[in-house]
């Protein structure tokens, strides 16, 4: 089974296409990077950057086949602006998954660590 793993972010969003068969391996991966447009209003810039993320993820959907998307769950910190930006990236991921008919599972970082290392 092949899955698409996503690490949501606004300035950079990591992705990896993983073959989870008996011999697990990474088939492809990369980082989607966006840069702020200092000349645009903040809301216009965020919309533009969401568009960049959407275009890049949609290209992954076009080029690869996978059973589902596994993405890091949204967490909330004391940094409202950063949290809002990650939430916008999450919205893009959710919308594209729905449009492409691909289920999404959310994984908490501490759960992934526990499964891989056995410690909390």
Question: Where do the language-model regions lie?
Answer:
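Phosphate- and other anionic-substrate recognition elements at nucleic-acid/protein interfaces
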Residues: 1-120
